[in-house]
Amino acid sequence: MDSGSSSSDSAPDCWDQVDMEAPGSAPSGDGVSSAVAEAQREPLSSAFSRQLNVNAKPFVPNVHAAEFVPSFLRGPSQPPTLPAGSGSNDETCTGAGYPQGKRMGRGAPVEPSREEPLVSLEGSNSAVTMELSEPVVENGEVEMALEESWEHSKEVSEAEPGGGSSGDSGPPEESGQEMMEEKEEIRKSKSVIVPSGAPKKEHVNVVFIGHVDAGKSTIGGQIMFLTGMVDKRTLEKYEREAKEKNRETWYLSWALDTNQEERDKGKTVEVGRAYFETERKHFTILDAPGHKSFVPNMIGGASQADLAVLVISARKGEFETGFEKGGQTREHAMLAKTAGVKHLIVLINKMDDPTVNWSIERYEECKEKLVPFLKKVGFSPKKDIHFMPCSGLTGANVKEQSDFCPWYTGLPFIPYLDNLPNFNRSIDGPIRLPIVDKYKDMGTVVLGKLESGSIFKGQQLVMMPNKHNVEVLGILSDDTETDFVAPGENLKIRLKGIEEEEILPGFILCDPSNLCHSGRTFDVQIVIIEHKSIICPGYNAVLHIHTCIEEVEITALISLVDKKSGEKSKTRPRFVKQDQVCIARLRTAGTICLETFKDFPQMGRFTLRDEGKTIAIGKVLKLVPEKD
């Protein structure tokens, strides 16, 4: 008893000190500071000195206790740690939210059975050491398997993970904490460093497009849940919050609409990003805004996409509003084609709505109206387009075949994505990474999708059009650290040699030996989609090309092109009007990066917009050198 009391003077201040103690010794005072131990020593010794073995019996219940108790009150339950309550505090930290003792302690490597210390309590000091060591080793953070710890963090309602200092926290806080733990788990799994030689799944960017309120974000959230990227408790939390705001049917979309303004109004503004995986592929969801005010944001999302999902609402009245003139269904489909999207999946959503009730007649009606328009835009109905019915809210036909539509015999949405043929990308091509965004974080970080070539850590690159030499310090592919990346991956690259202020969206990272072209004047072929009046030389618009947005002027009209024969007119036209195709010369306000459509299609297609409308789409034919 005396030796135990005297040893309490050297109570460690942190768990690292406990780690360094000799395994065989009976440690004391590892949970409270030496000052507190000094104050408590006398009352403890007088209260418990001759009653150790009697009070040792409740040891097992105390290990499983789910509430915090001050260390000096728990002393009787753990005799060997009397004077300063060392063992009791160890159990206190563990007991707060870990009924099986899953917490702190990294002590002696002894591994007796749970019953053994109870039998030998009345014995000598060796029994004391065994009793103390048993929970320490079983629960030691060093020995504990990662899977085991996460399994228990999900099963057991935890108090505070940091140290168990508030065991009396109420259920709402506990559930919120658990959700944070769940999210943390997902993040941790993504921060693993992938070796450069590891086989990678093909990366595919999927952009969800369509009229406002068609259900794009809801389907995205449903996919996240069905593929395990968002856990059930997080969704239940979103559902509770959505009900409080009288937005019950919006809760799934909150998995992608993280911005408070987006949640309050139910409108996506930015392009939401999320990831999910199937057996063969790694997908990034780009949830584009459907509202006409945010079409420029949608173009930015579509320019990074390999595959577009056009979401249509089958609800009576909603389909007509979205598809008729003024709706965004038409414009989005056209912009997706212009942005270079090859495959289009048309999801006829809200089939569970009472006005539809999984009616094959309504499904076919929507399909019949859409096909002629999509054909006109440039999609081939047989090769490029696939229609399927679904319900984003209930998840029917998203991952598994639905009983509600026995008339649909094709694959559900997620299996269909997994079975798509591979996208042929050139790993040996020139490095082209259009910049989408940039920010400061221990250096300059740029975001973008690698269109061509491959990048490795430590590589020397050039930022065009300013010709800045930069070095790659680190690479994150969808938030996973890696040393090497291939085309199609969404990257965050930390650069050395350039300031964040010197970069603009639309700049391109290139190989020093193969720079991309840049300039201000170029010849193009354009199709006038929608414009009430005629367009003459001197007309100004906004150019969207890859991730770049720039003011542009039509300086000259060179010739008209016959839509059927492709023949060019011999005389220069004085103007062009809606539905005509022409060759024109454009000049931008500033220098931009671009390539001809023939050499590099992703950087040779563009859209012209004016007064909130897409007025023309086109492709770059020739770059005109600047006159000195």
Swiss-Prot record:
Q: Where is this region: Disordered?
A: 1-44, 71-124, 146-191
> Where is this chain compositionally biased, Low complexity type?
1-10
| Principal place of residence | cytoplasm
Q: Does the keyword Ribonucleoprotein apply?
A: no
Under InterPro entries, the record lists:
EFTu-like_2 (IPR004161), G_TR_CS (IPR031157), GTP-eEF1A_C (IPR054696), P-loop_NTPase (IPR027417), PAM2_motif (IPR009818), T_Tr_GTP-bd_dom (IPR000795), TRAFAC_GTPase_members (IPR050100), Transl_B-barrel_sf (IPR009000)
Per the record, the domain of life is Eukaryota
Question: How would you classify this enzyme at the top EC level?
Answer: hydrolase
Gene Ontology terms, cellular component aspect?
Answer: cytoplasm
Q: Which GO terms describe its molecular function?
A: GTP binding; GTPase activity
Region called G5, residue ranges: 391-393
Q: Where is this region: G4?
A: 349-352
Tell me the residue numbers annotated for binding GTP.
213-218, 349-352, 391-393
Give the keywords, sorted.
Answer: Cell cycle, Cytoplasm, GTP-binding, Hydrolase, Nonsense-mediated mRNA decay, Nucleotide-binding, Protein biosynthesis
Query: Catalysed reaction per UniProt?
Result: GTP + H2O = GDP + phosphate + H(+)
Note whether Transmembrane helix occurs among the keywords. no
Q: Where in the cell is it found?
A: Cytoplasm
> What exactly does this protein do?
GTPase component of the eRF1-eRF3-GTP ternary complex, a ternary complex that mediates translation termination in response to the termination codons UAA, UAG and UGA. GSPT2/ERF3B mediates ETF1/ERF1 delivery to stop codons: The eRF1-eRF3-GTP complex binds to a stop codon in the ribosomal A-site. GTP hydrolysis by GSPT2/ERF3B induces a conformational change that leads to its dissociation, permitting ETF1/ERF1 to accommodate fully in the A-site.
Which family, according to UniProt? Answer: Belongs to the TRAFAC class translation factor GTPase superfamily. Classic translation factor GTPase family. ERF3 subfamily.
Q: What is the official name of this protein in its record?
A: Eukaryotic peptide chain release factor GTP-binding subunit ERF3B
Q: What is the lineage of its organism?
A: Eukaryota, Metazoa, Chordata, Craniata, Vertebrata
